[in-house]
């Protein structure tokens, strides 16, 4: 990505969306070898012109975002204020799509989550249901027949023993409480120390209503730890 390409993309986005303002604009997939400074300047330019609101990145490491924001602070510029990594109960054990997918889920990403918490950067959490692993369609009692509902990327990225054991614990809690597996997975994501907003792909209207109810569900600290297997 370079400044010229970013300007072209921004103008194309405004045109295709038939709007003169984009509320949240995210850069996708970082190239750590590229110079972020001209990119940050363009984003600031479009923000000051009233064409974009908040801006940030998807699949950028927290270290890279921190570097951007430190520079922005030094130059009296507007920093990144939002990020979209993979985050949820499913730990990413392989890169689902290739090309540098960033996850902040699981035991190994404690430092990343602490950075988001300390810097008050909200997370737009993609794959918060593990590509469907925690949608309720996959059942640990019948993995042979229910695994087929997942796409190849979900199997590649999230199908592992640790996640299946976690799914089993969620199923048990769902049975106890009369909630769905997806509701518990979404509630867990929203009740972490990181301020997270789950992004979910839904094909049926009834699923929308079901998932929205997750915003009203409350899990105890013991339940949060029980299903994840690690501290927040």
Question: What does each model-identified segment do?
Answer:
Residues 34-232:
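Beta/alpha (TIM)-barrel catalytic core signal, keyed to glycine-rich beta->alpha loops juxtaposed to Asp/Glu
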Residues 1-17, 66-70:
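Short, acidic/polar
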Residues 14-35:
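Active-site groove signature of glycoside hydrolases
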